[in-house]
Structures are given as C-alpha cells and as structure tokens.
Amino acid sequence: MRLVRAAGLTMTVLALAGAAAPPGIVGSGAVAVAFRMSDPRITESSGLAISRSRPGLAYTVNDSGDGPYVYAIDMGTGAVVGVTALAGVEAVDFEAMGTGPDATLLVADIGDNDADRDVVRVHVIDEPRRGSVAVEPRSVELTYPDGPHDAEAVLTVGDRLVVVTKEFVGAGFYAAPVFTEDSGTAFVLRRVGDAPAVVTDATVLDDGRVVVRDYGRGYVVRPDGWRQVGRFRLPRMPQGETIAAADIGQVVYAGSEGTDSAVYRLRVPGPGADGETGRRPGERSTAASGHTDVPAATPPSTPPSTGSGTAQLAPWLMAGGVLALIAAAAAVRRRRW
C-alpha cells in the first residue's frame, strides 16, 4: 500500500501500540494458520472473501500495481487454482472484497490515499470456479456525499452495499441500495454510522453481525444502528489487511499483505460475550457502562503480555508523542505557506 509519509509513520506507531494491548483485553482462544498464500503472484493481498457456493475456495486480489485479476485459492493447500480477469476494467486501487447476494463476489476499487477520486467503483461478478477465465462484471460507480475518502472495506447488508472509510478521525459506514431490483450503475452513498479508525477490512457473519478490523483488532458491530458491541485482538501480522467470514458459523479468516502471507482462522465471540453495551464505534468505555472487552484471540506462539502497567502503557504514550510531533510539523508547514 502506498501511503503518505506522515500517515505511514502514524500507522506504524499505532501498530506497535497494538502489539501490547491495554488492560482489559485478555488473550485467549484458539487461533490456527488456515493456509498460506505462497503463490509468487500474490504479493499484496488487500482483499479476501470465502466462497458461498464453491466449498473450499477463497478469493483474493492484489493492491494497486497488479491488473484486474481475482485469484481463486484452494483453502486446503493455499495454492492458486484459478485466475479471473475482469474484462474492460482498469484496476486503479483494488482494496477490498466481499460476498454479495446470489453467490456474487464484490471487487472493490475504492482505495484513495490522496482523497482525489470523485468516483470509486465496485465490480460484481459470479463467484469464480477453478481455472482461468475472463468475465465482464457489473461495475457500479459510487460517489460520497461529502467528498472523496480513502476506503479499504466493503460488505453487503440486505440490499445495501456498504463501504467503510479508512480515516484516523471521522471514519464512517456509507451505504447505497445497489442490490434492489431496479438497481442502476451509479449511486450516491449515504453515511449511516460512525466507524472505528483506520479500518482495513470488514465482513458479515452469518448471524448478521458485522466485523471490521484495523491493524491489530477486530470490532463487532450491529448494523441496526451501527453500534459497536465488542472487540477482540487479532493475530500479529506484518500488515493486517484482510478479514472474511466463513460460509457458516462465527468464524473469520484474517490475513496480511506480503509474500507467503499466512491466513489465520479464528472464532468471533458470540453475542452477549461482552454485555453488548451498545457503544457506537469510537466511544470510550467506562466502569459505569459495564463493558468488558470480549476474550481476545492471539496466536499460541505470542501469549498476551504480563508486564507491568507502565510497560502496557508505554506503546500508547509513544503513539501519542509521535502524533503530537506530526501535528506540530503540519502546523509549521502551514505557517510557511
């Protein structure tokens, strides 16, 4: 992913902060490597989806720099068993995938690091089979009501396509009725809720709950009001970019960019595991709320930290310091102009 310097530095610090979770997030639960994307063609897996109609297949796309290709992955071996080319499509910045109605697949060209794309696109195709083929997708043009946004997450809720923007402040869920019977090809998105900061992917569980992720955690959200009802820690990854729900059950697969990247399988805590306090994403929990973070999922090789309170807080203090430096630098630059 191509990031501006300041954002890249900030995300690096936030990732370090996430490596030592604050008190209240306790590591437990089984996590396993489901498969590895070892094919040399997959270098920047930025989207992941699990097939609903073809058992044992997953799909991924590369970040910007590759062509308009969808790779079918055998989940038993991690091998690429099919490549689907999207005919007539220019891949600007593929950043997300999702599953749609009637065994369709969403390929979201919604990345916009510089926030200068007036229109972004989501391409809809039938879930590919094994083998190589070229298909002509249904391409949907999307416009934000409040100007361009960077985004790396797409999902469907009922007949609505939902995009989750990737921002440090003011991130949101934006929706459009893309899958109604009289659907067109161009839509103005509507903001329907607030999202956590720096979301890199999202998915929908079979019970209807939405799971979004950042570089270190997953957040459980109810789409009837877009309220955050839980969170859990994700396995440590070089650059965690993907999350996809299994075809059945409360299981998700989480992956990273990079060559030979591992895809982890983990279970999402069930409804009520944290009291379902109804907090909206970004709201702080308090003792009065009764909120308790859901049990975290961590790899067996990386047990949760048992260090002192000072050690637990150190990464967060470092993150705050770097953010302050970035803000100061920006202020100096404005004065020069």
Predicted regions and their residues:
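Sequence/structural signature of beta-propeller domains
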Residues: R2-L9, G18-W337
